Amino acid sequence: RPPASLTFVVDISGSMAGPGRLELVRKSLNILTDELRDDDSVSLVTFSDKAETRLPMTRLKGNRNKIRDAVDEMRPARSTNVEAGIMRGYEESVEGHREGANNRVVLLSDALANTGDTKAENILERIDSARREYGITLFGVGVGSEYGDAFMERLTNKGDGHTTYVGDEEQARKVFVDQLPAHIQLRARDAKAQVAFDRKTVKQFRLIGYENRKVADEDFRDDSVDGGEVGPGHTVTALYAVRLREGASGEVAKATVRWLDPETRKAYEESGTVRTGAIEDTLWGSAPQRLQVAAVAAYFADTLRGGDLPGTPALRELASRATKLASETDDDSVRKLATA
């Protein structure tokens, strides 16, 4: 992969002093310092009521101890001014911008802004302009069980990135050893998916989630309209609840995926169709295991939000299905879902 130029923007406000927050951030950044290559570069910005550059853009080679020292010196302070932190972080990222490198801002915060521009308009404008002019993207890491996920997601959506969550050292290793290094190099930029249902066979359909990531039909092939980014080994799942017409037979939907090559910006498209025979069996019967896992997670999340998805099983049944799937898939994340 090309070298990475990463700017870490770390929330050191009072709310980050709670158990498993700032200390976990320190451990996370030290883990990543060990994983990055010698030709990668990092800078470090912290923020509470104001922002401070703790480390300007620094090459990893010969400087790992210097980087660890800057990370270990972080201490919790006062209120949270996310605007100040992100503005300073993007200044550092632009100043340390490297042609041909993957330039990224990594925000680590509980995202509970309480001073500065909490409506985020100034922040969003800055994130968008840096993305367009310099190709700088944003990776958001939520810390703490009460982190402001909706606010964090707004920021990363504008920054052509995505969010993840860290709650313990095991998750930190997964994010900073597996996820972040994989996403330093993109496989697809501004990826979009469109599903067209056939009204002759489909009575009702509903997209589950993605409320703030919907793209208008007329914007699907407009490559100036922001999509999502996909890294190596990264999968994106969109689930639909579908009700067929009685006695329906034939094509149910046509799904199309469109994306840009990260280097050439050339657009590509691929399409596929789904027919009634593919969805005649019950979900819990012969459906692929990963689809069942996704369904359990979606039903569980919708229940927590007070949703009304048709056919939602009771929590006890969801837990039972998750436990069964955990034993069949030998997947640690499914085991955690079963005990959530």
Predicted feature residues:
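Generic detector of intrinsically disordered, low-complexity, polar/charged segments
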Residues: 82, 108, 139-141, 206, ...
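Long, C-terminal catalytic modules of enzymes
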Residues: 192-195, 199-201
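Long, acidic serine/threonine- and proline-rich intrinsically disordered regions
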Residues: 202, 210-237, 242-340
